[in-house]
Amino acid sequence: MAHKKAAGSTRNGRDSESKRLGVKRFGGESVLAGSIIVRQRGTRFHPGTNVGIGKDHTIFAKADGKVQFEQKGPLNRKYVTIVTE
């Protein structure tokens, strides 16, 4: 049995905590105002109607309704909108 650790092994063993990013409410789901729809780094998704964006680029609902994802515009950007009933 070795009494010395292998070279380099003592410098391993660290990793950052996962940030739980991604889509939290999918297309067609009902949401209430203030609900978080997407957590993201940067603007992978852009806010559409009845949707706001936080300082950390979190997309959230400004009104009650159903989530709708769409791609539009000359740059084919992804937009999140809330369709109110």
Curated annotation (Swiss-Prot):
Name recorded for this polypeptide: Large ribosomal subunit protein bL27
A GO MF term: structural constituent of ribosome
Domain of life: Bacteria
Pfam families: Ribosomal_L27 (PF01016)
Alphabetical list of InterPro entries matching this protein: Ribosomal_bL27, Ribosomal_bL27_CS
Family from the record: Belongs to the bacterial ribosomal protein bL27 family.
Keywords: Ribonucleoprotein, Ribosomal protein
Single GO cellular component term: cytosolic large ribosomal subunit
UniProt-annotated stretches for the region Disordered: 1-22
GO biological process: translation
